[in-house]
Amino acid sequence: MTLAAMTAAASQLDNAAPDDVEITDSSAAAEYIADGCLVDGPLGRVGLEMEAHCFDPADPFRRPSWEEITEVLEWLSPLPGGSVVSVEPGGAVELSGPPADGVLAAIGAMTRDQAVLRSALANAGLGLVFLGADPLRSPVRVNPGARYRAMEQFFAASHSGVPGAAMMTSTAAIQVNLDAGPQEGWAERVRLAHALGPTMIAIAANSPMLGGRFSGWQSTRQRVWGQMDSARCGPILGASGDHPGIDWAKYALKAPVMMVRSPDTQDTRAVTDYVPFTDWVDGRVLLDGRRATVADLVYHLTTLFPPVRPRQWLEIRYLDSVPDEVWPAVVFTLVTLLDDPVAADLAVDAVEPVATAWDTAARIGLADRRLYLAANRCLAIAARRVPTELIGAMQRLVDHVDRGVCPADDFSDRVIAGGIASAVTGMMHGAS
């Protein structure tokens, strides 16, 4: 089956479900992935997704139950900024905002939605903590969904069981979604999105603890991701990065299948043997007693978690969740360095020395001299373009980074001064 035939068949949903469209080989799958991973168009839209850990202020060692959290959300009216609310495997709450016309509109909408969600949870005796990793509680899954049950089983059967459980239930992030932009600029744009990763991780690192202990890392969240299978969670770029669609296709076909959904029952089960998707699509292995379909391929792509993921747009996935005082400035900085063409050109030079320093950024952050210099250069570029509404947040971030301080340092200081429980409770009550 050619790509054109496969795509046409997959789009005829009135006559045939995509589950019925079998992919004949890995070449067709690769073409399907590469051709659909980014969409040609102008820059400008920004979408934000923000996760926060849900705690009980009266007992921060307790993990609120699925029933407690969902009862609040069931009574929640539509949010003013249009965000959709969901619950992560460990009970973290996520706000997923719609695409907005520009970064300022996206920040404003998310700020309004956060305020409504916080108020609703507070009325139920619960609170939100914006940290990259849960500093207090052991990993426990509370979301009963079949996808997360299968994901848990997959990680338990692999060498990444411990970090997999931590990733699912004990981490929280800010995700920034941006237009892919004009096709002729895709390669440079995707390369820069990756190259900015270590510097932005160092700026926003906010997870010095996990499960009641200091980890020795500024971004324990990023460390957790680094401990997992690089075939699923590592950067997607090939040697040159000149062809992001081809790189993404190779990455996706090499990655092992995590779970399979039955087209008849929609039951989801974990794949506990190591089966690269290419083996399934080429018929070397049958899963669920059959060959792979378009629906299987589309679902497989949702189980891959690189730091920059193409989904027609770009998902930037490497930022720790950070407090209100700085997250608007962090988001503005990243968006400006990617979407403003002059700022992007300057950023390429600023981050080139540390473009692959992912582990160093997560471990010691701004204590690394090269990351410190890159971070200050990037913030200077963004600060020259900051709108009036964000001057205060940007100045706080600039001052912090100039002193070599990230949010993880602030949280660590509060833990040392008053204990973990007090520091967590303080964040629910507004301490930054």
Curated annotation (Swiss-Prot):
It catalyses: L-cysteine + L-glutamate + ATP = gamma-L-glutamyl-L-cysteine + ADP + phosphate + H(+). PANTHER family: GLUTAMATE--CYSTEINE LIGASE, CHLOROPLASTIC. InterPro entries: EgtA_Actinobacteria, GCL_bact_plant, GCS2, Gln_synth/guanido_kin_cat_dom. Catalyzes the synthesis of gamma-glutamylcysteine (gamma-GC). This compound is used as substrate for the biosynthesis of the low-molecular thiol compound ergothioneine. GO terms for cellular component: plasma membrane. NCBIfam families: EgtA_Cys_ligase (TIGR03444). This is Glutamate--cysteine ligase EgtA. Was identified as a high-confidence drug target. The keyword GTP-binding does not apply. GO terms for biological process: ergothioneine biosynthetic process; glutathione biosynthetic process. One of its GO terms (molecular function) is glutamate-cysteine ligase activity. Weakly inhibited by L-methionine-S,R-sulphoximine (MSO) and strongly inhibited by D,L-buthionine-S,R-sulphoximine (BSO) in vitro. Its EC number is 6.3.2.2. Keywords: ATP-binding, Ligase, Nucleotide-binding. Pathway: Amino-acid biosynthesis; ergothioneine biosynthesis. Belongs to the glutamate--cysteine ligase type 2 family. EgtA subfamily. It comes from the Bacteria. It comes from Mycobacterium tuberculosis (strain ATCC 25618 / H37Rv).
